[in-house]
Amino acid sequence: MIFKRAVSTLIPPKVVSSKNIGSAPNAKRIANVVHFYKSLPQGPAPAIKANTRLARYKAKYFDGDNASGKPLWHFALGIIAFGYSMEYYFHLRHHKGAEEH
């Protein structure tokens, strides 16, 4: 109930039709309000095209009907590659000739 009331305040009411504007002192101000609300875009907002690498990845694997489990595989493979590179740097590079073992 409260949510419905909060959302209803975001949508402006029809203030007045331009036909009913008379010679009242604030008629010009109401005409400006009517013109402002008529000039607002109507309908859904156009989709924003992803332009960064992370935004394209998110659009490809997370948004809409494209949601999948591939990012989990990417994360796991990244951890494995990172772990192996650290293991190589800190340990395996010292044993290239295998004379120590």
From Swiss-Prot:
Subcellular localization, as worded in the UniProt entry: Mitochondrion; Mitochondrion inner membrane
Coiled-coil ranges from the UniProt annotation: none
Key words, A-Z: ATP synthesis, CF(0), Hydrogen ion transport, Ion transport, Membrane, Mitochondrion, Mitochondrion inner membrane, Transit peptide, Transport
Record function comment: Mitochondrial membrane ATP synthase (F(1)F(0) ATP synthase or Complex V) produces ATP from ADP in the presence of a proton gradient across the membrane which is generated by electron transport complexes of the respiratory chain. F-type ATPases consist of two structural domains, F(1) - containing the extramembraneous catalytic core and F(0) - containing the membrane proton channel, linked together by a central stalk and a peripheral stalk. During catalysis, ATP synthesis in the catalytic domain of F(1) is coupled via a rotary mechanism of the central stalk subunits to proton translocation.
A biological-process GO annotation: proton transmembrane transport
Keyword Protein transport appears in the UniProt entry: no
Protein name stated in the entry: ATP synthase subunit f, mitochondrial
Species classification: Eukaryota, Fungi, Dikarya, Ascomycota, Saccharomycotina
Misc. comment: Present with 14600 molecules/cell in log phase SD medium.
Biological source species: Saccharomyces cerevisiae (strain ATCC 204508 / S288c) (Baker's yeast)
Pfam family, one: F1F0-ATPsyn_F
Location of the transit peptide in the chain: 1-6
InterPro entries: ATP_synth_F0_fsu_mt_fun
Quaternary structure, from the entry: F-type ATPases have 2 components, CF(1) - the catalytic core - and CF(0) - the membrane proton channel. In yeast, the dimeric form of ATP synthase consists of 17 polypeptides: alpha, beta, gamma, delta, epsilon, 4 (B), 5 (OSCP), 6 (A), 8, 9 (C), d, E (Tim11), f, g, h, i/j and k.
Gene name of the encoded protein: ATP17
Family: Belongs to the ATPase F chain family.
GO CC terms, sorted: mitochondrial inner membrane; mitochondrion; proton-transporting ATP synthase complex
PANTHER family xref list: ATP SYNTHASE SUBUNIT F, MITOCHONDRIAL (PTHR28161:SF1)
